[in-house]
Amino acid sequence: MKKRLFVLSLILLVALDQLSKFWIVSHIALGEVKPFIPGIVSLTYLQNNGAAFSILQDQQWFFVVITVLVIGYAIYYLATHPHLNIWKQLALLLIISGGIGNFIDRLRLAYVIDMVHLDFVDFAIFNVADSYLTVGVILLVICLWKEEDYGN
């Protein structure tokens, strides 16, 4: 992926995350639940003082430091490995985008706005940035696993 496309994609993904959070705050009261796709997905405005899926509540400085380290390392890795395959680039793009999206909330609000509730499973309420992080990490693990299978 070319550097310009990567940066543009990063900006668009972070903007989508921030716009989704802005929309939730302006249309749904704190704690209110609104069906989005009945029986599948509801929207619920929550203020999360923890990490992804509400773990480690009230540890903001810990998350700021970890986020800066992870994003910094991902950018360093991209810069020093210019010939990564598209899947690793996509994984790192999602990880960086998700990290930045939640980092903006932590710095601006001292909490992260969560809103997506899966009605069909007992699971934590999460946000778009959490989704980026989850998919990015899963994709990166698959890439690394495949490399190991092929002896790279």
Curated annotation (Swiss-Prot):
The source organism is: Streptococcus pyogenes serotype M3 (strain ATCC BAA-595 / MGAS315)
List the GO biological process terms. Answer: proteolysis
* Chief place of localization: membrane
| Active site feature | 114, 130
Q: Which HAMAP family match?
A: LspA
Q: Where would you find the membrane-spanning parts of this chain?
A: 5-25, 61-81, 84-104, 125-145
Topological relation to the membrane, as annotated? Multi-pass membrane protein
According to UniProt, this protein's pathway is: Protein modification; lipoprotein biosynthesis (signal peptide cleavage)
Entry EC number(s): 3.4.23.36
* Enzyme class of the recorded protein, top EC level: hydrolase
UniProt keywords (A-Z) are:
Aspartyl protease, Cell membrane, Hydrolase, Membrane, Protease, Transmembrane, Transmembrane helix
Function of the protein: This protein specifically catalyzes the removal of signal peptides from prolipoproteins.
| Disulphide-bridged cysteine pairs | none
Q: Where in the cell is it found?
A: Cell membrane
Protein name as annotated: Lipoprotein signal peptidase
* NADP among keywords: no
PANTHER family for the chain: LIPOPROTEIN SIGNAL PEPTIDASE
**Can you state which reaction this protein catalyses?**
Release of signal peptides from bacterial membrane prolipoproteins. Hydrolyzes -Xaa-Yaa-Zaa-|-(S,diacylglyceryl)Cys-, in which Xaa is hydrophobic (preferably Leu), and Yaa (Ala or Ser) and Zaa (Gly or Ala) have small, neutral side chains
